[in-house]
């Protein structure tokens, strides 16, 4: 054993050119393992250039000089340098000691991108797929939106007094769907759509949405809002700002009311037919339908004499029907009412039940004021 240690000591001195005491220190620290001792020496400040390490057994090493048939091994063959970009993607690397001739490399978890880097990736991906940077334009108070050109009919005036005017029909505009304009605001800790709530960058449920933006695609949830129409998406950079939810714009009351003094409350519908149709369309679009799950049609007979038919999933709850009625008839929000079945005539008291649990598939529901 003593002779092997002397051989290792002489070989360490021959390879590194250091003093014998310093060589003994590194060998003792490495348990007299020549390979580990050399690695520790160069990590401690030794030259990182190519070094010659004998691979022969200690008994075959001549005293004083390195053997002539050594195999050349570089220090970089012992510890592999990693590219900076690869380290960022794969995580930090650690080396754990093993047996005398082995070791283990441990790769840490991938480093998460900071919100600033994530926003950079989103804008970079959008620009690579055709997005154009524009200056933000803010409307002054009282400024209206761009007027739409008139597309109706009219009368062509006669050229002479005795010539009658002729009616000319206008061209009917074709609408294949509902065009939607959405503003995506990228904040310090998350993003928001228009004046909606903050959605975290780290939330797994938002990963598909952000990946679609990075690929220059319109996310599926925005395409569903358009119902086949065009989606115009604007991206605003607020990465240095904390999210502040804007105050909702004031809207004058245009709903329905009740006549006071009558024994049974009578709902008065003060909205115009166009406004009522718009409310019903908004209420219908607020019900998210999963086409992969079974669906059913529910007929609702309202207290004001109206009738609504809406598609639901079997997993929707009775409370979803109540919300649908309030959205379709905003005046009902201030009205106390219950939902009942027609036959048998029974009140649906537990509104947490699903439509399937309450046996309401393809059923007729009646609204009764209380």
UniProtKB/Swiss-Prot annotation:
Stored InterPro entries: NSFL1C_SEP_dom_sf, SEP_domain, UBA-like_sf, Ubiquitin-like_domsf, UBX_dom
SUPFAM superfamilies on file: NSFL1 (p97 ATPase) cofactor p47, SEP domain, UBA-like, Ubiquitin-like
Gene Ontology cellular-component annotations: centrosome; chromosome; cytoplasm; Golgi stack; nucleus; VCP-NSFL1C complex
Motif Nuclear localization signal mapped to chain: 109-115, 172-175
SMART domains per UniProt: SEP, UBX
Region forming the signal peptide: none
Protein name: NSFL1 cofactor p47
Species of provenance: Mus musculus (Mouse)
Compartments in which it is found: Nucleus; Golgi apparatus, Golgi stack; Chromosome; Cytoplasm, Cytoskeleton, Microtubule organizing center, Centrosome
UniProt keywords, alphabetically: Chromosome, Cytoplasm, Cytoskeleton, Golgi apparatus, Lipid-binding, Nucleus, Phosphoprotein
Keyword flag Acetylation: no
Similarity comment: Belongs to the NSFL1C family.
